[in-house]
């Protein structure tokens, strides 16, 4: 069976970790503003590419953290598609005061398009 993972925040980190653990069954991985795995040896185990949707105004998972993730994925020989939105952490949560409708809709469209392409 093919496995696709999607997660937000802590779940975004778990999405990446679950895709690593899924091995050859991993078909797609979407992570919304989750802390990336930093260990290049772990990233080498990925059997799918990753769509990373990040919050450009985020302070904890900063643009530096995202750039390091990009570099580590390249070192691991893995494909990463990154998009950073002009929004803060939690932008896709409608119950959050910093909810950003435009960023949420754009991220959702990217995620759905990616998942459809990977799960044919």
Residue ranges and their predicted role:
Residues 74-120:
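C-terminal catalytic histidine-bearing segment of alpha/beta-hydrolase fold enzymes
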Residues 34-41:
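Alpha-helical scaffolding within the catalytic cores
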Residues 57-61:
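Acidic catalytic loop of the alpha/beta-hydrolase fold
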Residues 12-23, 29:
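Short glycine-enriched nucleophile-adjacent loop
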């Amino acid at each position: 069976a093919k496995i696709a993972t999607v997660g937000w925040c802590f779940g975004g980190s778990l999405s990446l970790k679950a895709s690593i653990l899924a091995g050859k069954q991993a078909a797609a991985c979407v992570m919304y503003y989750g802390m990336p795995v930093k260990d290049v040896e772990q990233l080498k185990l990925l059997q799918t590419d990753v769509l990373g949707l990040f919050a450009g105004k985020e302070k904890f998972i900063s643009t530096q953290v995202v750039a390091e993730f990009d570099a580590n994925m390249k070192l691991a020989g893995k494909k990463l598609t990154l998009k950073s939105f002009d929004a803060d952490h939690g932008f896709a949560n409608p119950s959050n005061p910093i909810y950003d409708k435009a960023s949420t809709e754009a991220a959702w469209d990217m995620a759905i398009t990616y998942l459809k392409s990977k799960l044919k």
